[in-house]
Amino acid sequence: MLRASSRAPPRVRACVATRARHPPRLARGRSARATTHEDVFVDALVHALGAPALDRDDDEELDAYVARALAGRAVVVSRVACIVAECAGLPEATAAVATAKTPTREARAELARARGVASALFNACMSAYNRLKDWESCQTLVRLMEDDAGCAPDAVSFSLAASAMARAARDGEAHAFLLEAESVLKRGTRRNKKKKKVRVDDDMWLKVLYETDDVAAVHKPAGMLTHSSEGAGKSPSLSDVALAQFGELSDLNGSDKRGIVSRLDKPTSGVVILAKNNKAHAELVTQFYQRAVTKTYWALVDGEVPLGAGGTIIEPVDGRPAKSDWEVVETFVGDRWKYALVRVNPRTGRKHQIRVHMASVGCPLTGDTLYRRGRAKTLNVNAPKCVLDSLSGGKTGTTFFLHAGETMFDVAGKRVRVNEPLPVEFSDLLDKLHAASSKASS
């Protein structure tokens, strides 16, 4: 077992205690819990290494910082794992549940929280070793995470370790490790007995934007689920169609999410990357985790914002730090309505991030009711007919205009750029808004 709190290295105990008494001042919009634990871990690691403190700017991810801290230093991996557990509060939380005759709900919740924090820190350390091309330390951390810390490795954990092996040309080890990952991850998956087999016809085939033996980039139409576990329905999901179309896809993320590395909301259209095998899946997950994948979205939003307005939004999503760059590229103004076309580049990949962030600056996505608050509810209540017609195809709040127009990622060491123009419905609506706006201003 990892050492209990009382046996942790004195520098680690002192650092954790100091940080608990004097938490750091947080940048606007950052998650207090996530930032505090990250800062505690960073301080504890640097102190334990006996290394000078390294400057870290707001744009540097935790794993990149840890890689810089570990670079050139001989550090026993189990020591890093001990620091992770200590900073997450895992020894105390585990002991509180293990020693209690009947653990309280609060104690169990605290253990679950500590395991969640520890898992996130473990993954950051694995990504750091991945950056350092140290596949053996990645593998060891997965073992320590599972056997000693009591944290279940997830698809990200296995992907970071497997891609480190593949990048080091240890294909045999990577293959064996991914086979083990399939078995471990399937044990924690509850089978969906209600899922019915859906029929996929040839006319449903996805538009292929890019393809190799290992990956494919396809166009997801608006209104299609990315994978079947997102909700019930008789219509095939993108994963269903892709499996029928390509014949074989990765299953590292579960049998109901075959090939899916990153999802898009049902109303969102655009580029989706698929992994055809688990080795490619692990590499793509690593690229997403290390922010090597860049995406550009186009969104139609409500509100009056000047042309060229924009900036960087730093606002947590579901308690996790999130950042997006945005810019207004066209405005549409009528007598009683105002819209804007914005370009958004998410720097992180949280669920509903763009929807949350645009609503946070007073420009919710046109048609999106979920994140509309306060005065935003009164925006464009007298919408033009072209907008009303475009939103009339489904229930209120289930249609909005968001398109993943460009994705860049690496394949075999080369940078790949995949573009997909706006869908006809989106483009036609912009043309009609432009015409109506020009008429109103004349």
Regions found by a protein language model. Give the residues of each.
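Hydrophobic anchor position in alpha-helical repeat solenoids
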Residues: 44-45, 65-70, 80-84, 99, ...
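Hydrophobic packing position at a conserved site in alpha-helical tandem repeat units
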Residues: 69, 73, 80-94, 100-114, ...
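Pentatricopeptide repeat
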Residues: 38, 62-63, 118-123, 127, ...
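RNA pseudouridine synthases
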Residues: 7, 21, 25-28, 33, ...
